[in-house]
Regions:
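Charge-rich amphipathic alpha-helical interaction elements
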Residues: 1-125
Length: 125
């Protein structure tokens, strides 16, 4: 196997690794968006419930508002914890993707330089 073929294979491998890292980032971003959507829905439900509690005195006296707020707090805490974990994972994956991108670029540059040298050698008898 020639050096040029080895470089081409190296470039293909680094491209694949970068594509894999990019796919992982997309999945993590999808998870982040899902959690953020759930948090937004929870905030909307909180606003709606607050208006209902203001208009229905029976719900307040029955303690439904307190139970709702406790449940709401637990849900927010859970979702925010999950979001923090996803964001930490996203940051870790971004670092890996940056490294993979660097390798991909170096391999591509090495292939281009090898091709340029070969062309130069072919022109010079």
């Amino acid at each position: 196997m020639s050096d040029k073929e080895k470089l081409r294979e190296l470039a293909e491998i680094t491209d694949l690794v970068f594509a894999m890292q990019s796919a992982e980032i997309q999945e993590t971003t999808r998870q982040q968006a899902l959690i953020e959507s759930k948090l937004a829905k929870l905030s909307k439900a909180s606003e709606d419930a607050q208006a209902r509690f203001q208009s229905d005195v029976g719900l307040r006296f029955g303690g439904a508002d307190v139970m709702w707020q406790a449940w709401l707090g637990q849900q927010r805490k859970s979702l925010n914890t999950e979001l923090a974990a996803v964001l930490a994972e996203k940051e870790r994956r971004l670092q890996k993707m940056k490294f993979a991108f660097g390798r991909k670029e170096v391999a591509a540059k090495m292939c281009a330089e090898a091709a340029a040298i070969k062309r130069s050698d072919e022109r010079d008898p």
